[in-house]
Amino acid sequence: MKQRLFLMVSKAKSLCLVGAVLLSIQLGFAAGNEIVVTNNSELTTAINSAKPGDVIVMKDGEWKDVNLSFGSTATEEAPVTLKAQTAGQVILNGNSVLTLTKPNLKVDGLVFKGGAINKGAVINFNSDKCTVSNCAIIDYNPASFDTRYYWIFFSGNYNLLTHCFFKGKNNIEPVLGNAIDNSRHNTVTFCYFKDIPYAKQNGREIMRIWGPGKLGKPSDDGAFFTVEHNLFDHADGEGVEIVSLKSNHNFVRFNTVRASMGAFTNRQGHNNTFEGNFILGENRAGTLGMRVAGENLHVFNNYISNVSDNGLLLMAGEYMDKALTDGFKPGHGNKETLGAPRYCQVRNSVFENNTIIHSGGKGLQLGDAYRKHWPEMQMCLLPEGNTIKNNLIMNCAESNIDVVPVDADPATSFLQFAPNKFEGNVVSGGEVKGADKVSGILKKEVKGSFDKNGLYILKDAKEAKTVGANEYMTNTAECHPLQPNEVGPSWMK
């Protein structure tokens, strides 16, 4: 009887254990060992011997010259995690770097501070389905400005960078970038980019997203990169492009820019989306809104205010079918092959429900850089076939809307452009140039007030729902100006 009772109890315990394991797998957890390491040698051994589900814990303190090649074997159900003993208290310096070399790895709570490297990247996603969270890179700069390296680089797919902090990068190369090939479906979310000093040097974007479409026509392929819920605070870099898309099929949404020099830019690439971003210039010199080139873009529900320069610029494109003059100097090719345009024509895109207030230049311009650097560059393709509707543009210093006219130069007289469609746009307190007789632009004095976030709200409730960036009113949990306590690592709060 006792033996039978023992067997029944043992069987019950086994069933409970199996149930617990199954439940943990269903919830995304996996049982594993916790391995505490205190030096570089122990860290290397732990990484090489870790099993799926294990957690490697780096002891608090300073870690110098750590070549952290994280390549443990893991699975989606049982990732291997590398974490700080106390988030924010493991400080890597010297020439320390982190490279994730196998899939399904997680890194949490590390800080790279005060060190420097001479090439590559401080953190490199060199695999797929990895996550880096709750980490920081602070003042990780070389002695020479010309020493080139990224802080974050993606050369894999389906990776996630979330709730991290970046401050003080002052050398050449963007803070964050990705590989042209084999880098798709990566995401950067809830990160905080602060105090990136200005230096007049091309290639110092805060983010530069390469990939399919960089030099080509629209296609089904692209980088599929998502940049969302990030805060850029005095993040100047090169002072021209904050986020620079140079690939197809990307999403830039629900981000906040505060007093940062430069613009959100669709530099190259097509089928990209800019949604629900807040670009708040705070009247600081060098601030801009958005600048785009390319086809099949969707730019909507963005709020741009108090930038010192232009609000939303639709670029002129470069004509590449043939050389129109002997002075043409193609940028990507030669006079026989011509190659790809330096700027693509803005075509078949939708710009809707954006609010642009108090820009120091133009509010909305169609045809920015038209015939600029002629004849070396053939920037003579004006935007065509676009839909511009339900935008609110107010009190911009140079003009609220500026539609650049076609030049009478015989060299370009053969070009004809499909009309752009204007519908339901409201402008107030500023000029309209080149579109005075265009239907779909209503000039009127609007009434409204500024809410607690400093955002302009129209007094007319019906008009407020249809004109301007209205998503921040209807979906404030998802779309509102971000504050520092909403982004970055938890240990900073």
Language model feature labels by segment:
Residues 34-41, 60-67, 73-121, 131, ...:
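Right-handed parallel beta-helix/beta-spiral solenoid domain characteristic of secreted/periplasmic
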Residues 15-26:
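Bacterial N-terminal signal peptides
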Residues 30-32:
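Boundary at the C-terminal end of the N-terminal hydrophobic targeting segment
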Residues 67, 94-99, 113-130, 137-435, ...:
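Glycine- and acidic/polar-rich repeat regions and solenoidal domains
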Residues 2-17:
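Bacterial N-terminal signal peptides that target proteins for export
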Residues 434-493:
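Surface beta-loop-beta hairpin patches that serve as ligand-binding interfaces in beta-rich domains
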